[in-house]
Amino acid sequence: MITQKTRWTFVWSFLLGLGVLLTGCTLESWDPVGGPSAENAAWTSEVQGEGQLRVIYLDVGQGASQLLISPSGRTMLIDAGNNDKEEEMLHYLQAYGVSRLDLVIGTHPDADHIGGLDRVIDRLDIGEIYMPKIQSNTKTFESLLNSIRRKGLKVKTAKAGRELAWDEQVQVKMLAPVAETDDNNNMSVVMKVTYGKTSFLLTGDAEAESERAMLESGANLSADVLLVGHHGSKSSTTARFLNAVKPKYAVIQVGDNSYGHPTKTVLDRLAKQQVKVYRNDLHGTVEISSDGGGYQITTERPG
């Protein structure tokens, strides 16, 4: 469990695209750990996991991207924000010492999720890439496919029931898409990541249709940390789904937008369940680290 004690610490972090400045970070539990810093900004061939699972919800504005670093230092990137966030994504990865991504997941073809993946694939060493079986005729999607081809990679199909061999200490299981549909959001890859007694549910833009399919599949949806679906849209995070997940903490990847994200409906549901909410628009990048028994939550800003 996270202790209730909150304290301030200061770490060096990138002001992406402008240089480096000192920013305040808020930290709950344990001791401070390194985030983006001037000391670890150089490209390295290996990331140090330090025995912790690190799930980093990168602040990419109105988009989504999560960087996972396993206890043994293996890396996974889920989505990479919009097209205009390509350079920021590269700065983030550099700041975390990542030059190789063992796994890349493109949750679905929407530009605010896969827009930066082409540049990431062009620049970094890539192990495997998974995407759902759905096509798009957008320039963003075609650019991603071209980068994949140039790298000589083969896309593996992301679907419910698939388990990924990433780190022997961490279970990574895909819970969606359960069935094929023409709707991009409801073809989103949903993954549950479990390390010891701790668990994370990463939902992409999955909406009510996908949530219902997961519930009906009988999958174990319970997780301590929930990435709120579709940036907090009222089309996602249904009451029934939230009751099944029973999260203690939730992260909403959202920026300035005209969609009304996150919606009051979803925020009220989370509040009713007494879920502690972290938001990229308020807190900046959010890192949740687990030692298998508890969590450490670090935010770029106090919110």
Language-model-detected regions and their locations in the chain:
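Non-globular, low-confidence helical/coil segments that flank catalytic cores
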Residues: 2-303
